């Protein structure tokens, strides 16, 4: 089958303009641009690696053909990540069960546990354990692990973790072959390279500062829910993405 080549509008051929448009314009108009309604989700607390509780939502259509398991990027939560909710609508409309979750230190998961992100040590296993729990709820294989930006990297870690499932997850009612694969957009494959580029570029520095502000909000949210987990002084000192990692993970 021959597929047409996608050609964006002239003003959106620039990657930065496309990013700004997505953040500033599409985020406000996306619901008017899709014919698919929001699935009826049920809330679920999954148990990830190391026993960490992870908040998620699940929707299962009649006769599902597979399951989409997804999360978002470096900041946000399930309530404001419209890009992920749009994916959920489209997937459900095409007959897929949908599992979306707040990953470690984000959203309602941060309210359940003060556990911080692990830079890939456990996020991949989280994905697989969530898929196994979703299977027990009636979500069928194959399971497709999805995400965008940093969430895409987490999904790829999930695919990697699934390849060694027999060595660490023998108690799970899930077989490696039931993980169909991953589908990611702009995964953050080399964080050092990405951050170095950001802080060297004038526009990039503004974007990095905006992300750092959101990370600081996230850290304060964890502190308010779990006062003993993060020192207020450490949060105050964390004014960059690298600073966030240095101050919070050294605490």
Give residue spans per PLM region.
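N-terminal presequences and immediately downstream first alpha-helices
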Residues: 1-32
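N-terminal cap/lid segment of alpha/beta-hydrolase-fold proteins
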Residues: 22-63
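Hydrophobic/aromatic beta-strand patches that form the interior of the parallel beta-sheet core
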Residues: 44, 69, 99, 144-146, ...
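Short helix/loop capping segments that flank catalytic or ligand/cofactor-binding pockets
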Residues: 54-55, 79, 192-194
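Short, surface-exposed "cap/lid" segments of acyl-processing enzymes
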Residues: 59-112
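Short, hydrophobic alpha-helix immediately C-terminal to the catalytic nucleophile
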Residues: 85, 89, 128, 156-160
């Amino acid at each position: 089958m021959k597929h047409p080549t996608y050609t964006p509008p002239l003003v959106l051929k620039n990657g930065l303009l496309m990013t700004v448009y997505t953040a500033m314009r599409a985020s406000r108009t996306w619901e008017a641009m899709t014919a698919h309604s929001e699935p009826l989700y049920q809330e679920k607390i999954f148990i990830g690696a190391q026993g960490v509780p992870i908040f998620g939502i699940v929707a299962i259509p009649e006769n599902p053909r597979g399951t989409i398991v997804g999360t978002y990027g470096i900041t946000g939560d399930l309530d404001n990540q419209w890009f992920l909710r749009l994916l959920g609508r489209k997937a459900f409309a095409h007959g897929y069960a949908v599992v979306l979750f707040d990953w470690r230190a984000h959203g309602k998961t941060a309210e359940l546990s003060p556990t911080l992100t692990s830079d890939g040590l456990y996020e991949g296993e989280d994905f697989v354990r969530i898929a196994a729990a979703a299977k027990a709820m009636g979500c069928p294989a194959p399971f497709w692990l999805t995400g965008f930006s940093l969430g895409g990297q987490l999904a790829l870690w999930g695919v990697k973790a699934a390849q060694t499932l027999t060595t660490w997850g023998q108690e799970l009612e899930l077989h490696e072959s039931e993980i169909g694969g991953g589908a990611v957009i702009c995964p953050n494959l080399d964080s050092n390279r990405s951050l170095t580029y950001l802080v060297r570029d004038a526009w990039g520095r503004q974007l990095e500062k905006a992300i750092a502000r959101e990370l600081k909000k996230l850290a304060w949210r964890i502190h308010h829910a779990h006062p003993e987990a993060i020192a207020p002084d450490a949060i105050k000192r964390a004014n960059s993405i690298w600073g966030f990692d240095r101050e919070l993970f050294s605490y």
